[in-house]
Swiss-Prot record:
Disulfide bonds: none annotated. GO terms for biological process: pectin catabolic process. It holds the Pfam family Cupin_2. Residues 35-94 form the Cupin type-2 domain. InterPro entries: Bacilysin_H2HPP_isomerase, Cupin_2, KdgF, RmlC-like_jellyroll, RmlC_Cupin_sf. It comes from the Bacteria. Pathway: Glycan metabolism; pectin degradation. PANTHER family: H2HPP ISOMERASE (PTHR40112:SF1). This is Pectin degradation protein KdgF. May have a role in pathogenicity. CDD domains: cupin_KdgF.
């Protein structure tokens, strides 16, 4: 568990292909993650067996597909993908950012 997140003290984790992330904070039941995308970077379609996910567009814009439904989301928009729903994104602008919230925490990220 991390009670406080200090941005300047937390390095980016490079994921490759124009995507990097910072784990903001977590408990056993909840996790928040900042994910930064280069223009054209792809969050490959996938689904979670046990995690619900809410993603808030903090900057830029994304093409989002959930269960085959495609939408364009811009700064201030959000989406939810519950467990077992196929979802993915494509960044439409340089520096697009998602704030992802997962329940329960993504132990595989720690």
């Amino acid at each position: 568990m991390r009670r406080y997140f200090i941005d300047d003290e937390t390095p980016w984790e490079e994921l490759g292909d124009g995507i990097k992330r910072k784990i903001i904070t977590w408990s056993d039941d909840l996790m928040m993650v900042c994910v930064h995308f280069a223009k054209g970077a792809i969050g490959t379609p996938h689904k979670h067996d046990i995690h619900d996910q809410i993603a808030y567009v903090a900057a830029g814009s994304f093409e989002v597909v959930i269960e085959g439904e495609k939408r364009i989301l811009k700064t201030g928009d959000a989406y939810m993908a519950v467990k077992n729903e196929m979802h993915g994104v494509v960044s439409l602008e340089e520096g697009s950012v998602l704030i992802d919230t997962f329940s329960p925490k993504r132990a595989d990220f720690l």
